[in-house]
């Protein structure tokens, strides 16, 4: 069904960047992606991409790396679908999903109805991302915590913000952040590079770097975007330069870029559910946006192991 899904993506620009066919081509490593689709009158009216993996005897649907959300999507045409129609289309998508031992997906925030999945035996937990509506940048800046504003001004006096650059520097700085916390980096460089090349080819990303007069890189980040929203995707700081405020400055510059260059009104922080990170999102004035994590475990063995 991948060819039909590719056509669906071309015909429906509201499909988020994470669910675009070319994006899935780049990030679906150690497995394969496909899509359930519903066709009516020779048109795809509903689609649901998924990433199928195998581990030992188990087949399961999971989230690819670098993919914040997937889920079901409906064709945009004319009046919105009624709840009855939405239930019917979602039910048809569910029926086309392959038989697997386990399923887990994070649905896009645009999906507000998971009831058909509940009726089919799926479960869900509510998760949160944080978003800004960029109607007025002055208002957004005024809504930022005063300590954050001081960090922005402090960094502006000590570093320059560069756009573009190379993915190797982003990887190096991001890895420093994980090393500082004694955490394993969840991806390898070759996958990040393939991911970044796809984004660059489709003009769907910008890189930001904070560099001081000596050439030292304090912070790095990446912003990815689609037709509606920009997402603060990957970021990191040099642990020895964290107090410069450069990471906060890069976040503000990404917000400005979203409004002033991309002309988009929605900025998504891509989470976070982590308490210390969530606090920073709120200090930028961002508002909670719920989304669904939906799962189902069909294998008795996996259910027993999950007790």
Language-model regions: role of each:
Residues 1-41, 47-57, 108-243:
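A conserved beta-strand-loop-helix scaffold within acyl/acetyltransferase catalytic domains
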Residues 31-33, 99-102, 205, 262-264:
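Short, high-confidence coil segments that cap the C-terminus of an alpha-helix
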Residues 54-71:
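Conserved acyl-donor/pantetheine-binding loop and adjacent beta-alpha core of acyl/acetyltransferases
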Residues 75, 91, 195, 201-306:
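Aromatic (often tryptophan-rich) hydrophobic motifs at membrane interfaces
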Residues 79-85:
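Short, conserved charged micro-motifs
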Residues 105-113, 269-276:
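Conserved beta-strand-loop-alpha-helix junction that forms the acyl-donor binding cleft
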Residues 144-147, 303-307:
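Short, surface-exposed amphipathic charged segments that create phosphate/polyanion-binding patches used
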């Amino acid at each position: 069904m991948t060819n039909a899904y590719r056509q669906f993506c071309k015909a429906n620009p509201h499909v988020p960047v994470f669910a675009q066919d070319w994006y899935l081509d780049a990030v679906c490593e150690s497995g394969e992606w496909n899509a359930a689709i519903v066709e009516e009158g020779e048109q795809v009216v509903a689609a649901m991409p998924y990433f199928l993996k195998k581990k030992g005897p188990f087949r399961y649907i999971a989230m690819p790396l670098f993919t914040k959300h997937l889920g079901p999507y409906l064709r945009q045409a004319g009046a919105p679908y009624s709840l009855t129609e939405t239930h019917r289309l979602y039910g048809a998508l569910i029926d086309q999903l392959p038989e697997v031992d386990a399923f887990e997906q994070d649905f896009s925030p645009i999906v507000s109805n998971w009831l058909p999945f509940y009726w089919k035996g799926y479960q869900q937990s509510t998760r949160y991302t944080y978003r800004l509506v960029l109607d007025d940048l002055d208002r957004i800046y005024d809504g930022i915590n005063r300590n954050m504003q001081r960090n922005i001004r402090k960094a502006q006096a000590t570093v320059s913000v560069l756009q573009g650059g190379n993915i190797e520097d982003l990887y190096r700085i991001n890895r420093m952040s994980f090393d500082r916390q004694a955490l394993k980096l969840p991806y390898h460089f070759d996958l990040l590079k393939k991911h970044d090349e796809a984004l660059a080819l489709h003009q769907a990303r910008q890189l930001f770097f904070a560099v001081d007069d000596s050439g030292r890189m304090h912070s790095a980040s990446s912003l990815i975007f689609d037709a509606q929203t920009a997402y603060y995707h990957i970021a990191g700081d040099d642990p020895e330069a964290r107090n410069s405020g450069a990471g906060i400055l890069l976040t503000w510059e990404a917000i400005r870029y979203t409004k002033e260059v991309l002309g988009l009104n929605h900025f998504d922080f891509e989470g976070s559910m982590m308490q210390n990170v969530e606090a920073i999102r709120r200090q930028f004035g961002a508002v909670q946006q719920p989304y669904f994590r939906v799962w189902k475990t069909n294998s008795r063995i996996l259910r027993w192991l999950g007790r």
